Amino acid sequence: MNPPRTLMLAAPKGHATTRGKRLRLRDFRDAPFIWFHRWANPVYYDRIMQVCVQGGLTSPRIVQHVVDQATILSLVSCRLGVAFVSETTHWHCPRGVTLLPVVDLDFPLPFYLIWRKDDPSALLQRFVAQVEAAQC
């Protein structure tokens, strides 16, 4: 397993709520959110809602439900709202979007690699070796 990734706030660059301060969940009580559908991953959905409630974001104002992070980032870049995304999305973030840490958003995202041990593929073995070498 690689070290867990964290969630970040994706916001349009220059968004009023994000200027010059340490961000907390409660700062986004009135912000429009772009959110993923609960049916896509009920456990993840319920857990992130629980973390939000604990941080004072008791009822996120969800203005759009989507199914993937690419769509989330596109809608954030169109200034439709803000969203929580994996920190790894910085590799393909649109220019108009900034990723910001939220100090009380404690929600690690573990990454696991699963493969069949009896698969003799040399390509698979090299891939697994690369992933293992990348672990910190």
Over which residues does each language-model region extend?
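Secondary-structure junction motif
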Residues: 32-55, 121-124
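Beta-alpha-beta core module
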Residues: 1, 5-6, 70-118
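Structural motif corresponding to alpha-helix initiation and N-cap regions
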Residues: 22, 68-69
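Short beta-strand-to-loop elements that line the ligand-binding cleft
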Residues: 59-68
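Extended ligand-binding regions for polar small-molecule ligands
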Residues: 110, 114-136
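Flexible hinge/capping segments at coil-to-helix
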Residues: 1-7, 11-33, 116, 122-125
